[in-house]
Amino acid sequence: MKSLRELELAGKRVLVRVDFNVPMDDKQRITDDIRIRMVLPTLRYVLEQGGRLIICSHMGRPKGKRVEEYSLAPIARHLAGLLGRDVGIAPDCIGAEVEAQVAALGVGEVLLLQNLRFYGEETENDAVFAGKLAGLADVYVNDAFAVSHRAHASVVGVAERVAEKCAGFLLQTEIDYFHKSMNDPIRPLVALVGGAKVSSKIGALENMLGKVDKMIIGGAMANTFLMSQGVDVGASKVEDDLLVTARNFLQAAGERGMKVYLPVDFVVADRFAADAVHKTVPADSVPEGWMALDVGPASSILFREALQGAGTIVWNGPMGAFEMDAFAGGTMSLCRDVAASQALSITGGGDSNAAVKKSGEADNISYMSTGGGAFLQLMEGKTLPGVDALEA
């Protein structure tokens, strides 16, 4: 996979795929622009090298129709402020009018194409649509790690049709950090896995067998593992169809010498609500009709001890329903412990990153990945279609 610095960009039409799928309020104001800021080094480099910059992205799920609330016009205005230069907004992402705008684009000028997902052909990796996008570019740059696990037209189809192609700085950084953490880690390597469902993480868990030295499992998915060991977790969320899978995983981990840490206590509630009655109980003493919504203080101490001396920490998924303050304690404690560690620490996934931001520890994490699904796919030991297309 070539890097951006290897290509000649002067005077070239440089099409950069980014992920500008940022949150907005009801007045079309951006509430968090981190995804835009993360690709600024790539965009600035293209401009510094005399490229003619064309940017493409999706936003939301307009399902192949033009939906004004998903227009990228507010992004163009915001980006102009960050770059300190005008950013044109195209009326569309393909077509004669767009082709004319690209042809007229001067060196150092910027054009943002309209939302790619206004066309259903984008998510279908349609050959004709990909060909029209590719026709706008002399050079293609993928700097959208967060969508590189999707075989979409702007991610795979365009890369297959443009001879000069490379990874942007953000995509390269993401791949490098993942390689450092999982393929060539400073040991011991500790994996923290949380979130709601075992079903969405089992591929990653099984791939990490034999690769990580310790694993901490929290969040609602821990209930299924505890239940597989005969622990009654009351009305807590359990995936009954995965009890055997969970039991087999724990057995395999033991056989390979990988220590797995499960919660030993919970903060339980009588219902899933911020104002629910709640209390702390041992993991095997969840009252009938109550549900576990966070790991308890004894679990936090256990997990802190498990992290001591770690060389590398990889974290995907929260320990509880941290969006409600009553059930945020376990996740916030873990954020502080990971931040205090001397280990190389990497978080992946929207919930994990949101938790770190809530804790105020973002500056003390080595790297916060921009990709949830892409990060998880790498954790599963799979390649990313977007990266494969750059290497073809």
From Swiss-Prot:
Pathway: Carbohydrate degradation; glycolysis; pyruvate from D-glyceraldehyde 3-phosphate: step 2/5. Monomer. It catalyses: (2R)-3-phosphoglycerate + ATP = (2R)-3-phospho-glyceroyl phosphate + ADP. Keywords: ATP-binding, Cytoplasm, Glycolysis, Kinase, Nucleotide-binding, Transferase. ATP binds at residues 201, 323, 349-352. This is Phosphoglycerate kinase. The keyword Kinase applies. Transmembrane segments: none annotated. Its main location: cytoplasm. The gene is pgk. The lineage of its organism: Bacteria, Pseudomonadati, Thermodesulfobacteriota, Desulfobulbia, Desulfobulbales. GO terms for biological process: gluconeogenesis; glycolytic process. It comes from Desulfotalea psychrophila (strain LSv54 / DSM 12343). CDD domains: Phosphoglycerate_kinase (cd00318).
